[in-house]
From Swiss-Prot:
Inhibits RpoS proteolysis by regulating RssB activity, thereby increasing the stability of the sigma stress factor RpoS especially during phosphate starvation, but also in stationary phase and during nitrogen starvation. Its effect on RpoS stability is due to its interaction with RssB, which probably blocks the interaction of RssB with RpoS, and the consequent delivery of the RssB-RpoS complex to the ClpXP protein degradation pathway. This is Anti-adapter protein IraP. Induction: By phosphate and nitrogen starvation, and in stationary phase, via the alarmone ppGpp. Residues 1-36 form a coiled coil. Keywords: Coiled coil, Cytoplasm, Stress response. The gene is iraP.
Length: 86
């Protein structure tokens, strides 16, 4: 029983570490996108936003991905492009 608990705790710690790494990657990408947008002319920003939104619109829904997840992704991309980090 102790081995089972120890193994579960170890797996939980691994998952937490993976989660931290993913969060760091997302934060880094947000910083990069924000910096790029801030250094672009307004018309170039809008062109990029339109292209990204167009690409998202054209993506075919995947039955294996829940609609809520797809909508969450779309909302987050829009938020990032229209209101980058301060």
């Amino acid at each position: 029983m102790k081995n089972l608990i120890a193994e579960l705790l170890f797996k939980l710690a691994q998952k937490e570490e993976e989660s931290k790494e993913l969060c760091a990657q997302v934060e880094a990408l947000e910083i990069i996108v924000t910096a790029m947008l801030r250094n672009m002319a307004q018309n170039d920003q809008q062109r990029l936003i339109d292209q990204v939104e167009g690409a998202l619109y054209e993506v075919k829904p995947d039955a294996s991905i829940p609609d809520d997840d797809t909508e969450l992704l779309r909302d987050y991309v829009k938020k990032l492009l229209k209101h980058p980090r301060q």
